[in-house]
């Protein structure tokens, strides 16, 4: 009988968003337990080795993190399989680089560099609002943070702008029609658009209808929607493509136009 946590992850079973080649070995780095789920995170070893190419092997990544050079959300992380996830700020002081982990329109974590000003805060989705012992109100965010005494206007599915240094709420964005959101799950992963409407289905999944900046509409489940801005103004910078997914034909036309312009 198996006892205790699983310690291995087969390469074929690793999330597609990690973009590991399936013939590169039998196993993949299994993320440690932490603030993000296994299938929604990116271990530091993959970010440093496969994305940034700062190391060739896992052993080199271990040597980098053990020098206490890598910070996630302002805290030094020395575990190479630490699960960094959506909206986390990864900072490397030695190279003066700052990154925010965010999805591209193909649903993969992209290397998205940000300014020092933007690296001071992150957005967190509110997962739960409740009262604790002695009637102290608190909320729980998507990355496992518990924040006591929040603004009573903050409800589930809203987003809070969190100061990383102090873990204090700077601002919050309501979940309502007309606000900008990013999709964090399902087949529309990584797309950005404004909320059009919300269909309530008690006992089942609420459906949210979203319209992107090119006028395309799509729908997804409520728990896949992450509010990132008031109106059309995003609180964070977006990666290349601005969260607009092109159809295959549109991608082809864009490539041909670029080729013609380059000749």
UniProtKB/Swiss-Prot annotation:
Q: Which PROSITE patterns match?
A: RIBOSOMAL_S4E, S4
Q: Does the keyword RNA-binding apply?
A: yes
Please report the stretch or stretches of sequence annotated as the S4 RNA-binding domain: 42-104
- Any idea which UniProt keywords this protein has? Ribonucleoprotein, Ribosomal protein, RNA-binding, rRNA-binding
Per the record, the domain of life is Eukaryota
Q: Please give the SMART domains that the UniProt record associates with this protein.
A: KOW (SM00739), S4 (SM00363)
Pfam families the UniProt entry points to: 40S_S4_C, KOW, Ribosomal_S4e, RS4NT, S4
Q: Which InterPro entries match?
A: KOW (IPR005824), Rib_uL2_dom2 (IPR014722), Ribosomal_eS4 (IPR000876), Ribosomal_eS4_C (IPR032277), Ribosomal_eS4_central_region (IPR013845), Ribosomal_eS4_central_sf (IPR038237), Ribosomal_eS4_KOW (IPR041982), Ribosomal_eS4_N (IPR013843)
One GO-annotated biological process of the protein: translation
Any one GO MF term held by the record is: rRNA binding
- Coiled-coil portions: none
Instruction: List the GO cellular component terms.
Output: cytosolic small ribosomal subunit
Instruction: Write down the HAMAP family for this protein, in alphabetical order.
Output: Ribosomal_eS4 (MF_00485)
What family does the Swiss-Prot or TrEMBL record give for this protein?
Belongs to the eukaryotic ribosomal protein eS4 family.
Q: What is this protein called?
A: Small ribosomal subunit protein eS4
């Amino acid at each position: 009988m198996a006892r205790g946590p699983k310690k291995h992850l087969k390469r074929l079973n690793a999330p597609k968003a990690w973009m590991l080649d399936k013939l590169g070995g039998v196993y993949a780095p299994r993320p440690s337990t932490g603030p993000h789920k296994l299938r929604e995170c990116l271990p530091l070893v993959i970010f440093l080795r496969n994305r940034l190419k700062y190391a060739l092997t896992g052993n080199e990544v271990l040597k980098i993190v053990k020098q206490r050079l890598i910070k996630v959300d302002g805290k030094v992380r020395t575990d190479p399989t630490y699960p960094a996830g959506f909206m986390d700020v990864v900072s490397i002081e030695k190279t003066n680089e700052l990154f925010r982990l965010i999805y591209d329109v193909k649903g993969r974590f992209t290397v998205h560099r940000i300014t020092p000003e933007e690296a001071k805060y992150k957005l967190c989705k509110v997962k739960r609002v409740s009262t604790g012992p002695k009637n102290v109100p608190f909320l729980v965010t998507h990355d496992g943070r518990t924040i006591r005494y929040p603004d009573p206007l903050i409800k589930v599915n809203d987003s809070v702008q969190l100061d990383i240094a102090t873990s204090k709420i700077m601002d919050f964005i309501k979940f309502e029609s007309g606000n900008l959101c990013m999709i964090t799950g399902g087949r529309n992963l990584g797309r950005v658009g404004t909320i059009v409407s919300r269909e309530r289905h008690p006992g089942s999944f609420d459906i949210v209808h979203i319209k992107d900046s090119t006028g395309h509409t799509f729908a997804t489940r409520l728990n896949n929607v992450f509010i990132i801005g008031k109106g059309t103004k995003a609180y964070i910078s977006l990666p290349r493509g601005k969260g607009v997914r092109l159809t295959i034909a549109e991608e082809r036309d864009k490539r041909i136009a670029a080729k013609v312009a380059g000749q």
